[in-house]
Every structure is written in structure tokens, then in C-alpha cells.
Amino acid sequence: TCLAHKQQAVNRLLYRIYSPIXXXF
């Protein structure tokens, strides 16, 4: 569905933002 595709895009964006932070710790 369109909603699922949007959710996937949001999850990928959040991962891209929080990945360096997680990493950092």
C-alpha cells in the first residue's frame, strides 16, 4: 500500500539519522 511505502521511507530516513548516533555510542 501507499502507506506502507511511506512508512518504509520514514524508517529508512530515521535509520539514516540515528545510525551515526548509535554508532557513536
Swiss-Prot record:
KW Transport (keyword) present: yes
Tissue: Hemolymph.
Any Gene Ontology CC annotation: extracellular region
Localization: Secreted, Extracellular space
Assigned keywords, A-Z: Copper, Oxygen transport, Secreted, Transport
GO biological process terms held by the UniProt record: oxygen transport
Annotated GO MF terms: oxygen carrier activity
The organism's place on the tree of life at top rank: Eukaryota
Signal peptide stretch: none
Entry keyword annotation includes Nucleus: no
Purpose of the protein: Hemocyanins are copper-containing oxygen carriers occurring freely dissolved in the hemolymph of many mollusks and arthropods.
Protein family (similarity comment): Belongs to the tyrosinase family. Hemocyanin subfamily.
Full protein name: Hemocyanin subunit 2
Gene source species: Carcinus maenas (Common shore crab)
